[in-house]
Amino acid sequence: MTLRTFVSALGVILALILTAVAVPTAWIDQNIVKEEGFVRIAGELGNDPEFQDRLATAAVGTFESSVDLPGPIQSLAADALRSAASGMQSWSDYPQAWEETVRNSHRLNFGAANQPEEAATTTALVLDISPLVRLIRDHFAEATRIRIDVPAESLVSLGEPSHRQLVERVAAFAPLWWVAALGALISMLLALVAARRRSLVLVFLGLGGLALAALWTAGADLAGGVVGSLSSANGVAELFKQEFLTAAKAGFGEWILMAAVASGGVFVAGVIASVVSGRRGSRSASS
């Protein structure tokens, strides 16, 4: 094996290893750590009837526990709250309240600078349903003409205190995906420059990319199983975790599909280039 072949092979291996790290880390940064991506994924839970029913019940319970109504209007309030628990999702201002819920929750979990002490010490993840509680308050005020103050924050626990360390590590390291991506690009260019037959480099990069797509798929299933097995604080937390994992796996699956298609294209290009260069070599040898 010549030095050029060794350097080229090393470049291919490094490019694949760094790509294996860069792609899932970039996805996590764009879709979990960054607020807009998190809102896009978690926002889909707003269309899940079972989850929203449980969330509405939790919001109504929080509202009931935060107010002290006079006896004469308690029966009227009970009817209004039952209506809220069963029909909140049909309110025109519900989607906006749910999006605000998701945004507030992301800031509490990933914007660690100004987190309240309760969120920092009791659980790794919390869902701030105060926008939904305020929504119930506003509709309750319309029905009863009674305006009631509610807590600024209404937190639903989504995990255990030990889970926060994982969240903090993800938030700290995921934004550094570009370092691995840059290293993969440099390694790939080094492999192409050092190679005697660049077409073979493309072939191996394509095959490696297809293998990585399979590895990412298996890794996503494994990670989903591990996270899914973690204990949840309550029924709302368990349902949120399962539905969010399903949405996240589907989102990452789209990236895997694009990577597989790109890798297949690189592989085909390498095969074609290898065939063409082989024919040229045969012609020059015969002449």
What is each model feature region?
Residues 9-184:
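Cytosolic/nucleoplasmic, non-transmembrane interface domains of endomembrane
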Residues 1, 5, 46, 167, ...:
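Membrane-helix interfacial "entry" motifs
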